[in-house]
């Protein structure tokens, strides 16, 4: 795949291991397979770990990522705003954080399990057991971030 007679250079950004609880190998395989598919189409692909992508101030016109780190997401937003094509948009990543996603689904009347967003400082009284209690400020990072509760 060429652009103006030159190979298209694509930047890939891997997900930090801390954001892939129990799925480090799976996430690495997904990114590797995407990179290999782009290379078969003639692209030149360079993969960077999240922290290196930010620390080295990497730029690119075409970027694909599995980012979750806040600094990486902010860097991707700046690149997107500057015209880079980012597959797995940083804005989309932010919209998939549990609280934001739940609020968007409910506000747009998308069918969604009954959900409550509460502060950990608040008393939770609705009788909705059994239920799932999920971390709201981020994606699950440890197994305890998503817990099934059968009764009070």
Predicted regions and their residues:
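Active-site nucleotide/adenylate-binding loops and adjacent lid/helix of ATP-dependent enzymes
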Residues: 2, 10-14, 80-83, 91-152
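ATP-binding N-terminal substructure of ATP-dependent carboxylate-amine bond-forming enzymes
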Residues: 1-87, 92
